């Protein structure tokens, strides 16, 4: 191997062709693979644990090794039958974009270092702003995912509303809000007593009346309500809070409204999603994850801020060793001054290139398809004996559970549904996950992969139905 860490031009081509062939083979034959191929951790440890090599190895053989022992020992979140958590149905154009971004080693942190890349990011952010109804004056940037996007937005909210003085400040959100919000608030220094969880209604949306009452009570106690976090598509069941009502309340109370649309926000492209997400454009800040419902490879999240300059006012620092990168030219931007990351990937490229290659109409159709699949599952369960739909299909998520007619014990029913989900994964024909809603263990299905067909979904549900009957046989009849 070369001491200057280079391969010859021919070696680079051959290695690149080999990598591309592996990826295309994976994508074209994904449906023939089990959804999850993970094996015992001891076996993996024995195969992959070693000392750092003193000398190099043949890169072609190393790619074969990785394909056998790493890429075939994972859960394929891009598999059309992966219906657990939030699937990651990426697209090949996004993969190529990531390859190009790494190959050219783009540094989209300062205009002086990556002007073309920064303009692509500005353009793509503008597309998302327009899509979500944010004003032209709004700003944003791409980050690693929803967790970093929520942290970025809440850091801006702390600066804008509290000038970083968090004493007696209170933030409000529902019991269905993603845990990344709790983590972000912990990082930002908020204590447990400064976090107020508001009850949800029968549709698992935040109770606006309870929120209004709590804010009023907190003000009388000398506390400082400063932020309400709305759900624009919960991870649990796809519920969307009453965004217009929350915007009205926050406007009246001079409170920052942050909308977590990490999962659900892209659904605004669809007619049904747009109806559910009415008012999302009124949020002071918004997060969304293109690596979820915009079908991008990991990782890429996004944060939008309604008022311009808030990002740079919150994060900008200018030590002497980067003053050469400073710019005051209109239209130029240094994204490294707009968030937590200074070193950052050219994440915008895959979103930009995917929109350019496929067009927004294709994304709209793909999102509509995911919403329809969940509705198809709900309809199937509605006709099936011994099945309960716990939350109806909304934004591509439906939750349900199996209740054998002869069983009445809640604990037993919970255990059966847990075992059923484990057995589905073990059989390899699909993968679903469980969650807890209304004090019940439920099965959760998320159907956003555009390459899952209606026929496949019906076959999966038929197999799950038969497997549920098989699993329940091992449980004794229990009367309440």
Swiss-Prot record:
Protein name: Aromatic-L-amino-acid decarboxylase
EC number, UniProt record: 4.1.1.28
InterPro entries, per database record: Aromatic_deC, PyrdxlP-dep_de-COase, PyrdxlP-dep_Trfase, PyrdxlP-dep_Trfase_major, PyrdxlP-dep_Trfase_small
UniProt xrefs under Pfam families: Pyridoxal_deC
Role noted for this protein: Involved in bacillamide C biosynthesis. Catalyzes the decarboxylation of L-tryptophan to tryptamine. The tryptamine obtained is then probably incorporated into the bacillamide C peptide, which is derived from the amino acids alanine, cysteine and tryptophan through nonribosomal peptide synthetase (NRPS) biosynthesis strategy. L-tryptophan is the best substrate, but the enzyme displays broad substrate specificity for various aromatic amino acids in vitro and it can also catalyze the decarboxylation of L-phenylalanine, 5-hydroxy-L-tryptophan (L-HTP) and L-DOPA, with lower efficiency.
Catalysed reaction, written as an equation: L-tryptophan + H(+) = tryptamine + CO2; L-phenylalanine + H(+) = 2-phenylethylamine + CO2; 5-hydroxy-L-tryptophan + H(+) = serotonin + CO2; L-dopa + H(+) = dopamine + CO2
Gene3D superfamilies cross-referenced by the UniProt entry: Aspartate Aminotransferase, domain 1, dopa decarboxylase, N-terminal domain, Type I PLP-dependent aspartate aminotransferase-like (Major domain)
GO biological process per UniProt: amino acid metabolic process; carboxylic acid metabolic process
Keyword annotations from UniProtKB, A to Z: Decarboxylase, Lyase, Pyridoxal phosphate
Comment on activity versus temperature: Optimum temperature is between 37 and 45 degrees Celsius. Loses most of its activity above 55 degrees Celsius.
Recorded superkingdom: Bacteria
